[in-house]
């Protein structure tokens, strides 16, 4: 964007999302050291909390406001895979994205953008992360409250208390 303040905001978000979410999932999932795993796990969920707060603060639709940006694009793949794949495979079982109401609605909003649903395949993701493992067993869940990716079509699955 021409707006230098917006560009700086996107760049800052991109750096945080890459370090703690995109790469953070792999740091946690492929770590063979408990301390490295714990640090990556904590940074991942701390960043999810920060993003949840950001989306909740003023009811914004996307990370920087009312428009989809590069920061949203960077965050989407990891959050799309979190509940059905990374929760188990990457040992990121601190919470589901469904447990964060604003992130969940954001995820469903991005999934509903033209072409996004058609461009993603959880079958492919599950095969890639689980089918190539030592026993080639691919988990079937999660199945509640709905199976994935069908759940992404229901932004109101999360019920505020």
Residue ranges, per PLM feature:
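C-terminal alpha-helical interaction module
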Residues: 1-161
């Amino acid at each position: 964007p021409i707006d230098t303040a917006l560009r700086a905001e996107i760049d800052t978000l991109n750096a945080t999302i890459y370090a703690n979410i995109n790469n953070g999932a792999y740091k946690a999932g492929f770590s063979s050291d408990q301390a490295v795993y714990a640090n990556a796990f904590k940074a991942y969920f701390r960043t999810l909390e920060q993003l949840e707060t950001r989306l909740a603060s003023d009811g914004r639709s996307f990370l920087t406001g009312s428009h989809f940006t590069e920061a949203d694009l960077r965050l989407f793949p990891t959050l799309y895979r979190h509940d059905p794949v990374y929760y188990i495979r990457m040992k990121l079982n601190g919470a589901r994205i469904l447990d964060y109401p604003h992130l969940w609605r954001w995820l469903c909003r991005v999934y509903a953008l033209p072409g996004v649903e058609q461009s993603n395949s959880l079958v492919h993701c599950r095969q890639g992360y689980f089918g190539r493992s030592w026993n080639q067993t691919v988990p079937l869940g999660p199945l509640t409250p709905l199976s994935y990716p069908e759940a992404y079509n229901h932004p109101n699955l999360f019920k505020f208390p």
